[in-house]
Amino acid sequence: MKKSVFSLSLACLSLLATARTEPMNTFVDNLLSKMTLEEKIGQLNLLPGGDITTGAVMKSPLADLAANGRLGAVLNVKGVDKIRALQEVAVKKSRLGIPLLFGQDVIHGYQTVFPIPLAQSCSWDLEAIEQGARIAAREASAQGINWVYSPMVDIALDPRWGRIAEGNGEDPFLGSRIGEAMIRGFQGNYGRENVMACVKHYALYGAAEAGRDYNTVDMSRQRMFNQYFPPFKAAAEAGAGSFMSSFNVVDGIPATGNRWLLTDVLRDRWHYDGFLVTDYGAIGEMVAHGVGDLKAASVQALHAGTDMDMCSDAFAKTLAEAVKAGKVGVEEIDRACRRVLELSLIHI
């Protein structure tokens, strides 16, 4: 199915064919020059597609957004026919025909179910873990999925934390090696049977106080870099296509809007050049942390280094107005859009 959707995009739009024959940065430069501000912001917009799974594609608001270039990615759409139909809208009906990313949580297998990640880590069998990710990628890509929210490389020491089973335990060395293996398994050589990995949750999500999910984190920089950051650094160096920021606060600032975390460390120190997506609704949840209204949260998230908004609808609702008000520069929108386009076009 993935091959048929990609062939569809090539047949319908020579623009995407060019992406395979000229340097990606040149292609994206040309594409950005053709995009309106609203279309650029649309590429930063990730929305849920559960209504499509249970209903008709063309009756979903997502179809209208895709047709008007206001949508960059969708999560939780299941079914070959459903994904193909929405992808056809994006490549046939939108002005520029940019295809969509289709994301899914693929934690320990897709159709073939493997042991939970914590159990897999007990094996220390990196070859088997990589093979499991490769099988999951093959199965997911056959259904039209091209982006998976995995691996989760959060170091977790407190068994009270409810998501400890999704990670690799407390050892930063082992967690780093497993993250690398899963990225290799998922992404491979960017072929038809591969998917883009999304490393999560950056960062310190597994260190929530008292093991309470979403809770605050307060620790020294030394402990961060020695114990909690190594798997993320290893994943960045392994070429993971995307990172997902965490819900928790770091040094009193929500991770989604924390420039030190997202830019100073991930971008500048580790030289990561993939794109950053929020966790589900995280920009909207920043309001509860006292950052202001939804527009203020969007501006802070973008300034911090966030590239894609997952399901807050915050970028879509507020960034154009923020540009007009001088709160956000068009160059910031372009930078985020470029990151999303460069990585998504490789993996679609």
PLM region descriptions:
Residues M1-P23:
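Bacterial Sec-dependent N-terminal signal peptides
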Residues F6, I346-H347:
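Extended hydrophobic/Leu-rich segments
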Residues L15-I346:
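Glycoside hydrolase catalytic-domain context in secreted enzymes
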